[in-house]
């Protein structure tokens, strides 16, 4: 019984961690292709510089997770990508906490692109 309780708590925690942050929009890689040339959006890739150098989307600027996002314009939508969607989800939460209103995560990241 005690083991099942621990397992349930761990599963609940993992599900909670994967949930999108409040107010963060989520789009697919296919939807991303339709907005790549929108000048009212800022595209950031939060992977490491080595990952970015290996393969990237030209419209995305490399700003690794953990960097300071304060220099980004708060009046534009920020579209965030990583390799799988996990780091970009964390970056989106960080951006929302810093007061960015329009934040969008690319589901599945570069793996889905």
Give the location of each predicted region.
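Glycine-rich, phosphate-binding/catalytic loops in enzymes
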Residues: 59-62, 96-98
